[in-house]
UniProtKB/Swiss-Prot annotation:
Designated name of the protein: DNA polymerase IV
Reactions listed under catalytic activity: DNA(n) + a 2'-deoxyribonucleoside 5'-triphosphate = DNA(n+1) + diphosphate
Catalytic class of the enzyme: transferase
Xref: PROSITE patterns: UMUC
Function: Poorly processive, error-prone DNA polymerase involved in untargeted mutagenesis. Copies undamaged DNA at stalled replication forks, which arise in vivo from mismatched or misaligned primer ends. These misaligned primers can be extended by PolIV. Exhibits no 3'-5' exonuclease (proofreading) activity. May be involved in translesional synthesis, in conjunction with the beta clamp from PolIII.
Phylogenetic lineage: Bacteria, Pseudomonadati, Pseudomonadota, Gammaproteobacteria, Pseudomonadales
Gene designation: dinB
Needed co-factor(s): Mg(2+)
Organism for this UniProt entry: Ectopseudomonas mendocina (strain ymp) (Pseudomonas mendocina)
Keywords linked to the UniProt accession: Cytoplasm, DNA damage, DNA repair, DNA replication, DNA-binding, DNA-directed DNA polymerase, Magnesium, Metal-binding, Mutator protein, Nucleotidyltransferase, Transferase
C-alpha cells in the first residue's frame, strides 16, 4: 500500500490572533473572544496569556472572569474570520486540492502526490506556515504524519507556532509512548475507565486483544485497538459536508433525573449557537435534536421537524427523550440538522 503524507494545520488561537493583529494594543494581555458574561456568554477562544490563568474555549465567560479578573472579552467578528480562512485555504490550494476543512481554523491536507519540494510533506508544511505568517500575520502549527490520527496529534505537539513530523519509521515508537488520553474520542470518562483497567499508554493498550476491548467499550474498542497500533485509514475527504452540528457532554457524575438534565441545557445551547455562527453561509439550520445516553450506555436521539431552536423547544425534546429511558443520564447532546444550500456537487471553498 502506498505510503500517505498527511498534514494537519491548526491556527494558533485563531480568533484572538486576528483581533491582536488588527489591534496591537490587545497584545500581551489576557484576551478572549466570546459572549458577554452578563448574558451567559461562552468563550470561543483565548490567547496564551489568558490560558495561563486556566481560561479555555467553551468555558462560560463568567467563570473565565473569575479565573482572570483582568480578562478582556471582545465580541467575535465572524465575517473577518471567514475572510482570513478563505485566504489560508487559497494558500493550501497552491500545494494540493485534497483538503478537508474541519473548522474555520483547522484542516487536513493530503500531499501524497504533490510535486512541490520534490514531494516533501515537511517542506510543504514549512512553506505553508511561512506564507501564512508573511501574508496574513498570524501563526499556524502543523503536524506531518502518515495518517490523519497522527497528523492531528503532531500539530499539537509543539504549539504554538510549531511543526512536528512523524515519519513512517517513527510511528511505532511514537505511538507506544502516547498517553491514551491523547487518542481521538477518549474523553475524561473513558480515560478514567482505562486508568482503572491499568491502561495509561498505548503500550498498555496493546496488551489487550481486540475482542477484550470490544467487550469493555463496545464498537469503540475496535477503534481503540487500531489507534494503539497507529492505524488510521480514513481518507482526506475533499467533499466532506456537514449533515448536522451538535454539542455533547459526558458528565463525571450521572444526572439523576430530568430536572438535573434540564439545568444543563442553557450551557449546551450557548456552545452550540456559538458553533453555528462559525459555519459558512452555505448551510441553513433545520431540525433541532437531542441525544441522551443513559448510565447503562443505552441511548436515544429525538428530533422534530418544524420546531424552533429556542430553549423551550429543546426542553420539550429533552423531556420526551428522557422519558424513553427514565434512568440516570451520563451524556447529553444538543444539535441541529443542516440543510446544504450549496449542493453536494460543489467543491467546498470555505472552512466549514
Amino acid at each position: 500500500m502506498k505510503q500517505r503524507k498527511i498534514i494537519h494545520i491548526d491556527c494558533d488561537c485563531f480568533y484572538a490572533a486576528i483581533e491582536m493583529r488588527d489591534d496591537p494594543s490587545l497584545a500581551n494581555r489576557p484576551l478572549a473572544v466570546g459572549g458577554s458574561a452578563d448574558r451567559r456568554g461562552v468563550i470561543a477562544t483565548c490567547n496564551y496569556e489568558a490560558r495561563a490563568y486556566g481560561v479555555r474555549s467553551a468555558m462560560s465567560s463568567r467563570h473565565a472572569l473569575k479565573l482572570c479578573p483582568d480578562l478582556l472579552i471582545v465580541k467575535p467578528r465572524f465575517e473577518v474570520y471567514r475572510s482570513v480562512s478563505r485566504e489560508i485555504h487559497g494558500i493550501f490550494r497552491q500545494f494540493t486540492d485534497l483538503i478537508e476543512p474541519l473548522s474555520l481554523d483547522e484542516a487536513y491536507l493530503d500531499v501524497s502526490d504533490s510535486p512541490h519540494f520534490a514531494g516533501s510533506a515537511t517542506r510543504i508544511a514549512q512553506e505553508i506556515r511561512r506564507r501564512v505568517a508573511q501574508e496574513l500575520h498570524i501563526t499556524v502549527s502543523a503536524g506531518v504524519a502518515p495518517n490523519k490520527f497522527l497528523a492531528k496529534i503532531a500539530s499539537d505537539w509543539r504549539k504554538p507556532n510549531g511543526l512536528f513530523v512523524i515519519t513512517p519509521d517513527q510511528v511505532d515508537e511514537f505511538v507506544t509512548a502516547l498517553p491514551v488520553s491523547k487518542l481521538h474520542g477518549v474523553g475524561k470518562v473513558t480515560a478514567d475507565k482505562l486508568t482503572r483497567l491499568g491502561i495509561r499508554t498505548c503500550l498498555d493498550l496493546r496488551d489487550w486483544n481486540k475482542l477484550a476491548l470490544v467487550r469493555e467499550f463496545g464498537s469503540f474498542g475496535e477503534r481503540l485497538w487500531r489507534l494503539a497500533h497507529g492505524i488510521d485509514e480514513r481518507e482526506v475527504k475533499v467533499d466532506s459536508r456537514r449533515q448536522s452540528l451538535s454539542v455533547e457532554h459526558t458528565y463525571d457524575q450521572d444526572l439523576p433525573d430530568l430536572q438535573s438534565c434540564l439545568e444543563k441545557l442553557p450551557a449546551l445551547l450557548e456552545e452550540m449557537n456559538g458553533r453555528l455562527q462559525r459555519l459558512d453561509a452555505s448551510y441553513r439550520p433545520d431540525k433541532p435534536f437531542v441525544k441522551v445516553k443513559f448510565h447503562d450506555f443505552t441511548q436515544t436521539t429525538l428530533e422534530q421537524a418544524g420546531a424552533s431552536r429556542d430553549l423551550d423547544s429543546y426542553r420539550q425534546l429533552l423531556a420526551s427523550a428522557h422519558a424513553r429511558g427514565d434512568k440516570p443520564v451520563r451524556l447529553l447532546g444538543v444539535g441541529v440538522r443542516l440543510h446544504d444550500l450549496r449542493g453536494r456537487q460543489e467543491q467546498l471553498e470555505l472552512f466549514a
